[in-house]
């Protein structure tokens, strides 16, 4: 019973916040999960920053009353099972609706992290509900070219891409919104 509850919780985390490989499968199979999050959903604009170990959501009790030496081995086995199924790997969820996220560090690492976060947003939020404007230095344009294929980066009302990397694109995009 503990094992089934543990697996059920683990699957729920994995379903709601799939890893990169699973997300790629969702995209490649044109899954109905694409754009599944609506602005009214609690998890709209949520991204995962990584994984961490935490306690399970249910409680496992182990009573020590009446333990005799005859059942000491059984008790020890139960204690080990409780220990094994009390901790679960969860996603570190970050809500962009209520917080800002700043990234500092090596630009290669930062660009990979940004790619991960933007992909999470682009897969599960519709381009009608989320529009992305990327502002970056013209020298970094090669690192951001992949974004031009995302419908979220095309500002629907203006028929312009939300890619700001020069004075010209700044004036074109930011003065239009």
Each predicted region: which residue ranges?
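Accessory regions of macromolecular translocation/handling assemblies
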Residues: 1-177
């Amino acid at each position: 019973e503990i094992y089934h509850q543990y697996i059920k919780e683990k699957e729920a985390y994995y379903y709601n916040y799939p890893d990169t490989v699973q997300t790629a499968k969702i995209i490649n199979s044109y899954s109905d999960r694409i754009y599944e999050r609506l602005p009214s959903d609690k998890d709209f604009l949520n991204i995962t920053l990584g994984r961490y170990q935490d306690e399970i959501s249910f409680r496992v009790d182990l009573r020590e009353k009446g333990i005799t030496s005859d059942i000491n081995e059984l008790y020890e086995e139960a204690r080990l099972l409780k220990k094994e199924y009390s901790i679960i790997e969860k996603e570190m969820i970050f809500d962009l609706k209520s917080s800002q996220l700043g990234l500092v560090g090596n630009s290669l690492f930062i660009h990979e992290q940004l790619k991960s976060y933007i992909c999470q947003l682009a897969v599960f939020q519709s381009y009608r509900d989320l529009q992305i404007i990327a502002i970056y230095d013209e020298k970094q344009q090669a690192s951001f070219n992949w974004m031009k294929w995302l419908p979220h980066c095309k500002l629907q009302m203006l028929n312009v891409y939300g890619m700001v990397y020069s004075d010209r694109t700044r004036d074109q995009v930011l003065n239009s919104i």
